[in-house]
Amino acid sequence: MNIEVNFCHNMEHFGAFEENPKLAIAVSGGTDSLALMLLVKHWNEKVKGEITVLTIDHHLRSESTSEADYVSSICQNIKLQHVTLHWIHKGITGNIQAQARKARYHLLTNYCQEHDILHLITGHHADDIVENFFIRLLRGAGLAGLSSHNIFFVNNVRIIRPLFNITKQDLKKYLEQQNIKWINDPSNNSNKYLRTQVRDLLKSMLISFQNNFTVELLKKRIMLSQMHLTRALDSVNNEIIHYVVYAVKIYSAGFAVIDRKLFRQASPEARYAILSYLLMIVGANTKPQRFSSLQHIILHDIQEYNTYKTLHGCIVEYSIQYIIIYREFGRCYPRSKVVSNSVVWDYRFKVVDNRKNNRMNLTIDYLKKSDYHLIKSYVESNQRNAYFNYSRKILFTFPVIKHLEKVIAIPHIKYYSDKTIQESVSFVFEPKLISRWFHYC
C-alpha cells in the first residue's frame, strides 16, 4: 500500500476531527518526524486544518539550535507555521533521555493548551513499538506496560501516533522520494542507552534464527501480540471503571478508601491497576509502583486487618471493612508556603485565595501534634465527620492555614477560628496524576 494512502487510513482510525481542526506536529528534524510532517500536510489537504510545527531545542548538543533552524527552513519552503520551544535547564544529570522526554511533553502540551490546540501528532513508528515492547519486557512490565495505545491524553492534549504500522525504512524511502534530507542524532547509535542495546539484541536474535525469520516478520508478530494485549487491557479497563465506581472513594482531602469486600471480587489485574493509580494520586507521584510491592499489598489484604504498610509515599491501613490510603510524609514534610492564588502545597493542593481587603500574612502547613490540642475539642465534638470514621491519623495529612504560627483554619474539616477565612481561602485537590476514571468526594 502507498505510504500516503496508508497514513490517511491510519488517521481515519482515530475518528472524525472537528471542522478545520487546530493541529500541532512535533518535529525534531529526524527521519520519523520529518516524514510525519509531510504526511500530515498531505492528509490535511482534505481536512483543511491549521497546522503548527513544534521543534524542541533541548540545548544538550551544540548542533541543536542549527537543527531547529533547519526544520524551520523546511517549514518555510512548504508553507507551514513553525515554532521552536526551548528547554531551559542548568545541566542535566541522571537519566538524560527520561528527563528530556518529560520536558518535551511539558513544553509541547503547554504550548498546545496556550494556543487552544487539542491534537498533538507525534512520530512513533512500528520499529519504536517493537523496541518499546522488548524494553518493557526486560523491565517486567504487566499487561498495561506491554500493550500499546496510539492515542492518549497528556495535560488534556490529545496525543496521536499515526505511524504505528509504518517502518523507519519506509519513512526513509518516502523522504528520499520527496528529496528531503534528515538529521541523524548521534545519541540514537550510542550503546550507553538501553534502546540502542535492545536494537542490537534484536539484530543478533534475527541472525541466530537464520532464514526462518525476517525483520519484517518479527515486527508483524510483535505488533499482532500487542493488538491482543491491548484488547485484553481494554477489557480490564472496563472492569477497573466498574470497581472504581462501586468500591473506591477518593476524597478531596487527599486520601482514598477501598471497600475490601467488593475489592476482592475484582480480578488481580484490576486490583493491581486500581492500587497503582491510588498510590500515585494520594502519594503525589507520576510513576507507578513496582509490581512486586503491589503484590505484597494484595496478599496482605487477604488476611490482615488493624495493621498498616508504607508504600510510595503513602500509608496503606487495613481495617476490617476498608483499606485506607493516605499521605505519608516520612522524614520529608512539605514546606510551609505563603497563601496566594495558584500556590500548590505538597504537590497536591492548589490554593484559591479570594481575599480583597484583609491581606494578613497567612501560611499553609501541615498539622503538627503540638497544634492538635488547640482543635481537639472541635474534633471530638464532630465525630460524625466522614473523615474521622476511617482513621484519625488522616487529619495530620490535611493542609492547614496558619497566622503567626497558630492554626486558624482546617478547611477540609470545616474548622475556622477566623470566619473571614472560611469565605475567602480554600484548597482544590489537584494531584499529579489526573484520570478520567476517578472523581473526588
Curated annotation (Swiss-Prot):
Pfam families: ATP_bind_3
Reaction(s) catalysed by this chain's protein: cytidine(34) in tRNA(Ile2) + L-lysine + ATP = lysidine(34) in tRNA(Ile2) + AMP + diphosphate + H(+)
Source species, domain of life: Bacteria
Binding positions (ATP): 28-33
GO biological process per UniProt: tRNA modification
Coiled-coil spans in chain: none
Location in the cell: Cytoplasm
Keyword check for Nucleotidyltransferase: no
Cross-referenced SUPFAM superfamilies: Adenine nucleotide alpha hydrolases-like
Enzyme Commission numbers on file: 6.3.4.19
Enzyme class, broadest EC rank: ligase
Primary localization class, coarse: cytoplasm
Purpose: Ligates lysine onto the cytidine present at position 34 of the AUA codon-specific tRNA(Ile) that contains the anticodon CAU, in an ATP-dependent manner. Cytidine is converted to lysidine, thus changing the amino acid specificity of the tRNA from methionine to isoleucine.
Domain notes: The N-terminal region contains the highly conserved SGGXDS motif, predicted to be a P-loop motif involved in ATP binding.
The name this protein goes by in its record: tRNA(Ile)-lysidine synthase
Organism of derivation: Orientia tsutsugamushi (strain Boryong)
